[in-house]
A protein has these predicted regions:
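Rossmann-like NAD(P) dinucleotide-binding subdomain of oxidoreductase/dehydrogenase enzymes
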Residues: 2-98
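ALDH superfamily catalytic-core signature
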Residues: 54, 62-172
Length: 172
């Protein structure tokens, strides 16, 4: 069978731990799903030494390039999902409530810090005012707080660089 070695982003240590807990609680043996805490250089070194039969990387373009370079010497197959930050589209025939719920959740999930997050939304002009009004109401209802508390909707940014990027986007 296949095994999984999860090396998560250094800013998201709890995510890997929670996934490991869930898989192990479901009966997956420890040696089949492993959560590892590695820096970028160590990760690249392990891939370069062909420690894995396949690498699936989700993250930045720079990180993806590093994984491809590390794997190139051993011809280890690599699949990458890079950059992220997808657009959302609201057509004239859309259900505005459903569009707001789906797109705002997609934008705000994980405080907007996921590579599949909705970064920009294009709304048909006939629905624009209603969409914006409902989106503002949706955002205002979010509870900011400690991410370890179950009633928190949005916690802090993972690092200073992410916070600066969001501030810049807001100021635009």
């Amino acid at each position: 069978g296949n095994t999984v070695v999860l090396k998560h982003a250094t800013q998201t240590l709890q995510v890997g731990e929670r996934l490991a807990e869930a898989f192990h609680a479901a009966g997956i043996p420890d040696d089949v799903f492993q959560n590892v805490f590695l820096d970028h250089d160590t990760t690249s070194a392990l891939i370069a030494e062909r420690q894995f039969g396949f690498v699936n990387f989700t993250g930045s373009v720079g990180g993806g390039k590093a994984m491809e370079v590390a794997a190139a010497g051993t011809f280890t197959p690599v699949a990458t999902e890079l950059g992220g930050k997808d657009p959302g589209y609201v057509r004239a025939d859309a259900d505005v409530d459903a569009a707001v719920d789906g797109l705002m959740d997609g934008a705000m999930f994980n405080a907007g810090q996921c590579c599949c997050g909705i970064e920009r939304i294009y709304v048909h002009e006939s629905l624009y005012d209603a969409f914006v009004e409902k989106a503002v109401t949706w955002v205002n209802a979010l509870k900011l707080g400690n991410p370890l508390e179950t009633d928190t909707d949005i916690g802090p940014m993972a690092n200073v660089r992410f916070a600066a990027e969001v501030r810049a986007q807001i100021s635009e």
